[in-house]
From Swiss-Prot:
The keyword Acyltransferase applies. Pfam families: ACP_syn_III, ACP_syn_III_C. GO terms for biological process: fatty acid biosynthetic process. Keywords: Acyltransferase, Cytoplasm, Fatty acid biosynthesis, Fatty acid metabolism, Lipid biosynthesis, Lipid metabolism, Multifunctional enzyme, Transferase. One of its GO terms (cellular component) is cytoplasm. It is an enzyme of class 2 (transferase). The keyword Acyltransferase applies. It catalyses: malonyl-[ACP] + acetyl-CoA + H(+) = 3-oxobutanoyl-[ACP] + CO2 + CoA. It is found in: Cytoplasm. Its EC number is 2.3.1.180. This is Beta-ketoacyl-[acyl-carrier-protein] synthase III.
Length: 335
C-alpha cells in the first residue's frame, strides 16, 4: 500500500511526549543472571541499559503519561481531541487499552482504539491517524506507542533478554487547511517470514465437564531469529526509504534527521550508510532504553524535540520494522 497525496487537508505536528519507568536494568545486572557481559551486549547491540516496569507500572499508565506530556506541549482543550490511536502489542486489557487512556485523560469526545503491529506499530498508527485527519473525519489526534515487553521475555535466553525495555511515547497531530507536513508514507508486510520474530499464543488444556475441553489462553515468551531479522532490516529499510524519497521528490541530502525503530545500533548505522545519511543525522537513544517496540520512535523524537535538536520545519525520515514481518516509512516536516 502506498500513500496518496491529499491537497485539501494537511497534517500539522503540534506536540510530543514520552514516559519510561524509573527502574533501570543494566547490562551488568543481566550478566549476573545469564552468561553474558556488558562488553558483549554493547558490542552487538549498542545497548547499555533499559527501563523495566515494576509492580506499579502498566501500559495504560505509561501511555497516559506520554499522551498527557504531548498534550501539554500544545494549547489544546482536551475536549477538542477527537481521536486516540494506541499502538501496542502488550495491552493492559486484551480487549483494548486505548479507551481507558481516553477516560483517564478526560478526552470524552475522542474515539479511541488499539492498533497492533509490534515494532512497526507506532508508524502504522501515525499513518492511520494522519489519513483519518486528511480525510476530514477528525481534527485532533493523539498517537501513542507503548509496550511492556519485559513481561514476555524469557530471562534465561541471553539472545533476547538483553534487547528489550519498557516505555511509551506520543505525538499530538492536527488537521489544517494551510499546509501538509505529513509528506508521504509507504507500508509493507511479509507474513511468510513471520516466524523470524513472534510472540505466539500458548494454550493450556483443562478438562472441565466430561469430554469438553477448555483452553486456558496465554502466551509463550518472545521468539526471535536474530540473524534473519538483522538481514531483513538492513535490506528492506533502505529500499522502502529510498522509494519514499523518490515518491515525494526529496533526496536523502535534504533529510535533517533519520529516526529508525531502535532495534540494534548496527542496524541503524547500516541503514544510514546505505542511504548515505551521515551518522550525526541518525537519532538514537538505544543505549539508554533498549528496544521498547512501538515506543522507540516517539521516545527518540520527543527527546530530540525537548533537547532542541529537532526544530520547526526540520525534515524527518522515519521507519519502523519488526514482527509480522512488517515495515513502513514516513517523511514528515516537524511543526
Amino acid at each position: 500500500m502506498e500513500g496518496i497525496k491529499f491537497n485539501q487537508i494537511g497534517v500539522s505536528f503540534k506536540g510530543s511526549g514520552s514516559y519510561v519507568p524509573d527502574q533501570i536494568l543494566t547490562n551488568e545486572t543481566i550478566s549476573q543472571k545469564v552468561d553474558t557481559s556488558d562488553e558483549w551486549i554493547k558490542s552487538r547491540t549498542g545497548i547499555s541499559e533499559r527501563r523495566i516496569s515494576g509492580l506499579g507500572d502498566n501500559v495504560n499508565d505509561m501511555a497516559y503519561e506520554a499522551a498527557l506530556s504531548a498534550i501539554e506541549m500544545t494549547n489544546w482543550d482536551i475536549k477538542t481531541i477527537d481521536l486516540i490511536v494506541l499502538a501496542t502489542s502488550t495491552p493492559h486489557d486484551l480487549f483494548g487499552s486505548a479507551p481507558s487512556i481516553q477516560a483517564k485523560l478526560g478526552a470524552h469526545n475522542a474515539v479511541a482504539f488499539d492498533l497492533t503491529a509490534a515494532c512497526s506499530g507506532f508508524l502504522f498508527a501515525l499513518i492511520t491517524a494522519s489519513q483519518f485527519l486528511k480525510g476530514g473525519s477528525f481534527k485532533r489526534a493523539i498517537v501513542i506507542g507503548a509496550d511492556q515487553l519485559s513481561s514476555f521475555v524469557d530471562w534465561n535466553d541471553r539472545r533476547s533478554c538483553i534487547l528489550f525495555g519498557d516505555g511509551a511515547g506520543a505525538l499530538a497531530i492536527e488537521a489544517t487547511n494551510e499546509f501538509d507536513n505529513f509528506l508521504g508514507f509507504d507500508m509493507r508486510t511479509d507474513g511468510e517470514r513471520g516466524s523470524f520474530l513472534n510472540l505466539p499464543s500458548k494454550n493450556n488444556k483443562d478438562l472441565i465437564i466430561d469430554n469438553i475441553d477448555f483452553l486456558n489462553g496465554g502466551f509463550s515468551p518472545i521468539q526471535m531469529n536474530g540473524q534473519e531479522v538483522y538481514k531483513f532490516a538492513v535490506r528492506e529499510v533502505p529500499i522502502i526509504l529510498d522509494n519514499l524519497f523518490r515518491k515525494t521528490n526529496y533526496t536523502s541530502d535534504e533529510v535533517d534527521w533519520l529516526i529508525l525503530h531502535q532495534a540494534n545500533q548496527r542496524i541503524l548505522d547500516s541503514v544510514g550508510d546505505r542511504l548515505k545519511i551521515p551518522r550525526e543525522k541518525i537519532l538514537s537513544n538505544l543505549a539508554k532504553y533498549g528496544n521498547t517496540s512501538a515506543a522507540t520512535i516517539p521516545l527518540v523524537m520527543d527527546e530530540a524535540i525537548r533537547n532542541n535538536r529537532i526544530k520547526q520545519n526540520d525534515i524527518i525520515a522515519t521507519s519502523g520494522f519488526g514482527a509480522g514481518l512488517s515495515w513502513g516509512a514516513a517523511l514528515i516536516k516537524w511543526g
